[in-house]
Curated annotation (Swiss-Prot):
NCBIfam families in the cross-refs: b_cpa1
Gene3D superfamilies: 6.10.140.1330
Listed name of the protein: Sodium/hydrogen exchanger 3
Membrane topology: Multi-pass membrane protein
Gene name of the record: SLC9A3
Known disease link: Diarrhea 8, secretory sodium, congenital: A disease characterized by watery secretory diarrhea with prenatal onset, prominent abdominal distension after birth due to dilated fluid-filled loops of intestine, elevated fecal sodium concentrations and low urinary sodium concentrations.
UniProt-listed InterPro entries: Cation/H_exchanger_CPA1, Cation/H_exchanger_TM, Na/H_exchanger_3/5, NaH_exchanger
Acidic residues bias (residue ranges): 717-728
Segments in the Extracellular topological domain: 26-51, 103-111, 169-181, 238-244, 305-306, 360-367, 427-433
Function: Plasma membrane Na(+)/H(+) antiporter. Exchanges intracellular H(+) ions for extracellular Na(+) in 1:1 stoichiometry, playing a key role in salt and fluid absorption and pH homeostasis. Major apical Na(+)/H(+) exchanger in kidney and intestine playing an important role in renal and intestine Na(+) absorption and blood pressure regulation.
Effect of residue 397 to A/D: Abolishes sodium:proton antiporter activity. Does not affect cell membrane expression or localization to recycling endosomes
Start and end residues of each stretch annotated as Disordered: 679-728, 814-834
Amino acid sequence: MWGLGARGPDRGLLLALALGGLARAGGVEVEPGGAHGESGGFQVVTFEWAHVQDPYVIALWILVASLAKIGFHLSHKVTSVVPESALLIVLGLVLGGIVWAADHIASFTLTPTVFFFYLLPPIVLDAGYFMPNRLFFGNLGTILLYAVVGTVWNAATTGLSLYGVFLSGLMGDLQIGLLDFLLFGSLMAAVDPVAVLAVFEEVHVNEVLFIIVFGESLLNDAVTVVLYNVFESFVALGGDNVTGVDCVKGIVSFFVVSLGGTLVGVVFAFLLSLVTRFTKHVRIIEPGFVFIISYLSYLTSEMLSLSAILAITFCGICCQKYVKANISEQSATTVRYTMKMLASSAETIIFMFLGISAVNPFIWTWNTAFVLLTLVFISVYRAIGVVLQTWLLNRYRMVQLEPIDQVVLSYGGLRGAVAFALVVLLDGDKVKEKNLFVSTTIIVVFFTVIFQGLTIKPLVQWLKVKRSEHREPRLNEKLHGRAFDHILSAIEDISGQIGHNYLRDKWSHFDRKFLSRVLMRRSAQKSRDRILNVFHELNLKDAISYVAEGERRGSLAFIRSPSTDNVVNVDFTPRSSTVEASVSYLLRENVSAVCLDMQSLEQRRRSIRDAEDMVTHHTLQQYLYKPRQEYKHLYSRHELTPTEDEKQDREIFHRTMRKRLESFKSTKLGLNQNKKAAKLYKRERAQKRRNSSIPNGKLPMESPAQNFTIKEKDLELSDTEEPPNYDEEMSGGIEFLASVTKDTASDSPAGIDNPVFSPDEALDRSLLARLPPWLSPGETVVPSQRARTQIPYSPGTFCRLMPFRLSSKSVDSFLQADGPEERPPAALPESTHM
C-alpha cells in the first residue's frame, strides 16, 4: 500500500532476532517456519512477519508521524518560526536517508493511489464540512475567477514560456514537445489545498483573504485535473493527430467534469441529510453515516471521471446545516473530533512521505535551466495574473482588495502533494522526460512549502496585513448585521436589482419553506427560544468552571476562603429525582440527610468550639458533592450512556438554577427566605384549621381571606407517563413549565370570575406535566410563586400576559372585598319591542 519494496523480509529478520531473544529470555521456544517444523513436532510460538508486514508498517509510520508532531510542539520557539509542514518534510528527508542507508532502495514512497483515495478525502471533507458558508458564497465570484481563469493563465503562460526558452537552446537537448510543456504547466498550476491550509492557518490572515486563497486552492483542482487529462490524452494521440474537434471536446469536458462533480456532491449531501433525519433511535451510528456517505460521493465522482474533490467539498458544504440539526450533540462532537483527527493525521503523513519519497536517486534528473526557470515563471506569472484579475474584480467589489492583499495572494500560491501525485502518474513511455518533471516538481514543492512558508509570516507582519480576530461578535453587532441584511435586501428588491442580499434572502425563503421541511426532523424545525438556550449553555459552563476551580484549590478551599459570591452562585442542596416527581416525594426528600441533630445544637451550644464545628459542618454539607445514587456503568453496543462528569455537571446546573431563582425572588420581593417560609407555614396551618371546622373544606363566599393548597393527587405524575429521557434532556433547552392541568384548575374554591386567570386549553398537556428539576418543593405549595417560572417555549406560544393560576376565579381577599356580590341575572322580557 505504501509502495513497499522487496527487502521487507530482511528487515523482518532483524525484528525476528530481537523478538526471539525476548522470547528465549522469557522461557518460550521460538523456531522459524510453520506450526510443524522438519522434525514434525508442534511449535509453541512461530514468527509470521510476512503475515502482518503491511498493516504493521503502516501503523508504525502513523505512530512515528504522530510522535513527531508531539515533539515539534514541545518547543514553541521552533513552531512559531518554522511551519509544521516544513518540519515534517525535513523529518521525512532524515527518515528516508536512514531507510536508504539501510537498504539502498526506496522501500517507502507516496503512491498516487494512496494519496488520492485515502489521504486527500479526509482533508477536503474537513475543509468543506467546516466551511464558513456565508463567507465562501459571498466571495464565490472572486474565488471562481482566481480558480478558473487564474489556473488556465498560469498553465498556459508557464508551459509556453518554457517551450520558448527550450527553442532558444538554453535547456540543452531534451526530448520534449509543446504538448509536454503544456502538460507540465498544468501540473505546476495546481495550488495545493493541503499546503495552503497548513501555512495560512498559522499565519492568521484576515477572513476574506484566507477564504479567497483557500477557496481557490479547493476549486482550481478541478481545472487542474481537466487540463491534466486533456493534455495527457493529446500527448498519447500525438501532436500531429490533434484536431480542432478534440480541442472543443476538451473545453466541454471542463464544464462537464466541474459541474458534474458539484452535482454529485449536492445529491449525496441531500441523501446524507435525509438519512440522518431518521436516526433518532440509532444515535450511536450517526457519525458513521456522515463519513461513509461523504466518501461515497468522492468515489462515485471518481468512478464517473468527474471532479472528486469538488464532489466531496460541496457534499460537506451542503449537508452541514441539516446534519448538525438532525444528529445529537454527542454525535456532532464525535464527528467534529474524528474529522479533525483524520485530516490532521493525513496531512502529517503526506508531508512526511513527500520528504521520504525524495530520497531516491533513480527519480532524479537535473537540468539547472529548466528547474530555475520553472521557479521564476510560476512566481512571476502568478503575480501578474493576480494583479490583472484583481484590477478587474475591484471594479465590481464593494470591499476592495488592496495592493498588500494582492502581495499575499501572489505569495500564497503554494504547490504540494497534488502536483507530486499527478506527475508520478505520468506514463514514462509517452513522456520521455518524466524523471525531469518529477525532480522539478519536488524542487518546486520544497521551495514553496519551506521557503515561502518560512517567509510568509514575516512578510505579513512587515506589510501589516490585517489579521483575523478570534472573538465572538457582540450582540449589538449581530443585531445590526441582521438589520443591514434585511435593509439591503429590501433596497435591491425595490430597485429591481438582483444582488447578493436578494439572492440570499430568496434562498433562505426557499430553504425554510421546502428544504428544511424535507431534510430536517420536526423537532429541529420548531422555533426555539435562543435566549433560553444561551442561558442553558452559560449555566453549564458556569457549573463546570466552578467545579474545576474547586478541584484546583482543593476540596476544603471553600472553608478557608468562604466568599459571598460562592454562596450566591452555587447551591449544592439535594435535587429531586427525574423519575419520581410527586409532591409527597419532594417533601420527603427535602429533609436534611446528614446529622439532623446539628439543627438543635445551634439553639443550645454557644461556645466558640461548637460554633466552629457547626460552621464546618454546614459548609461541608452545602458545598461538598453528594452523589444521589450509585450509577451502574453497563456496556451497551447501541447506546452511549452519559459519563459521571456529564451527570455531575447536569446536577450542578440544576442546583445553580434553583439557587438563582430563590435569590431572584428574595431580591424582588424584599423578603428573607426563612421568614417567608415561616409565614407561609403559619398561613397554611391556619387555613387547615379553618377548613377542618367547615364541612367539605369549602369556605363561604363572604369570607374576606381565603387561601388554598395544591392537592397532591392532582400533581402526581401518572404511572403510564414515560419518564423523561436523560440524553434528550441534556441536548435540549430549558423548560420553564410547571405541572398544571385543566382538571386541577377547575377543582378550586369559588371566587370572582376573571378570564385572565383561566388556563389556556390549546396548551399541550404533556408540556404542562413536566416539572423543572430545579423547582423546589416550596414552589409547588405557593401557586403565585410557581407561576413566575412558567415562561413559554417561544413567542408563538406566548398567549397571555398574566401567569397561570390553579383556578379560573380569583381568590384574593381584596378583590372579593371590593367586588360586588354574585346575583342571578335578571330575567329579560320575552319581547323588547316598543
